[in-house]
Amino acid sequence: MTKNHKLWGGRFESSLEKWVEEFGASISFDQKLAPYDMKASMAHVTMLGKTDIISQEEAGLIKDGLKILQDKYRAGQLTFSISNEDIHMNIESLLTAEIGEVAGKLHTARSRNDQVATDMHLYLKDKLQEMMKKLLHLRTTLVNLAENHIYTVMPGYTHLQHAQPISFGHHLMAYYNMFTRDTERLEFNMKHTNLSPLGAAALAGTTFPIDRHMTTRLLDFEKPYSNSLDAVSDRDFIIEFLSNASILMMHLSRFCEEIINWCSYEYQFITLSDTFSTGSSIMPQKKNPDMAELIRGKTGRVYGNLFSLLTVMKSLPLAYNKDLQEDKEGMFDSVETVSIAIEIMANMLETMTVNEHIMMTSTETDFSNATELADYLASKGVPFRKAHEIVGKLVLECSKNGSYLQDIPLKYYQEISELIENDIYEILTAKTAVKRRNSLGGTGFDQVKKQILLARKELKAE
């Protein structure tokens, strides 16, 4: 039998076989937590020294060693070993190599259970802040673009069919509002992430006279977890993030679907920058919206990370179980995927060309003004249901002879109602149709201006 040399190996007579060790190790991915692990250790050892659990001299030596490791990490000079399993054991092993056996006192009153939970809270807190900044940029980009296109008229769609003409600025502001709610969800997520598990130890707390409020302050958490079992057992703050990330990616994906359509030959509403397009290896003419397609495709990946962690957690008894090692890769992957997707979307919007004339022209060769005619008839005293039927029949007739509602002679309109006047032709123009939709939150130009003004105030307040 080979003696077990792990830091936890005292109870064991033999070592893990190499292939089993590789299966159980997490250092290949949890090394992303290295800066957070060292930061948490710095707070922990500071507290140990100030509460006289270890001597001030010992605390000073450990802090000096941690500073050396932090400098080496920033310089890319730390090498991690699979034999040390995870980031926590790797850091402790490296610290021992730097300062000797006194490094072993760092783990006093601490378990890897509260250690990893603390690292993950610190990591996610950091990434939530970064993500919200990127969302702020995206939302600002949308407002700027909307302001430039208040008077750009495009078809509004239901069932992918032309429905009513709208302001392109209004369409963009719809996404602004979606991404604002995404930001609010991340802010609420931050509240549940901004808690300190440090000091919960393995599951039951510790017999040492630790000061959890001190480490909470040192790590800039809002407050410590009030229950040690809860602190080390749950990953709901990550599940909440993955859920919020999934909703955010869904919004990005919907927008990308529209961008993909709009830059097609059939629409030609926009032209994407070459920076966000690719070509074909066989078809020389192709300009493909690959970045938008990738965001759309990666949405399923983020959904998968959410379902994966929910499945891991669904039957776990309290407290810690090794299954929880599977909580990290999906979180890391989703953080990276969502962050780059937000950045790409913002830059794609900033650099695209809007083909205003084509958007406008597409509203002149359709029947998206049919509701305007029905509303006009209703305003002249025709019951709306009757007006709806009349206009439906007119659309059918026009469809058969290749004409549009604005082509019908006034004389024919006046056979329907003598109250119809020449102003009907102005009413039927797309610009007028948009302008008249001036109800609160509507697509009317004045309403879009109000939406933009409100958005500017919101952005300024953040």
Curated annotation (Swiss-Prot):
Domain of life, per lineage: Bacteria
Record-linked PROSITE patterns: FUMARATE_LYASES (PS00163)
A GO-annotated cellular component: cytosol
Top-level EC class: lyase
UniProt pathway annotation: Amino-acid biosynthesis; L-arginine biosynthesis; L-arginine from L-ornithine and carbamoyl phosphate: step 3/3
Keywords: Amino-acid biosynthesis, Arginine biosynthesis, Cytoplasm, Lyase
Family: Belongs to the lyase 1 family. Argininosuccinate lyase subfamily.
Listed name of the protein: Argininosuccinate lyase
Lineage: Bacteria, Bacillati, Bacillota, Bacilli, Lactobacillales
Gene that encodes the chain: argH
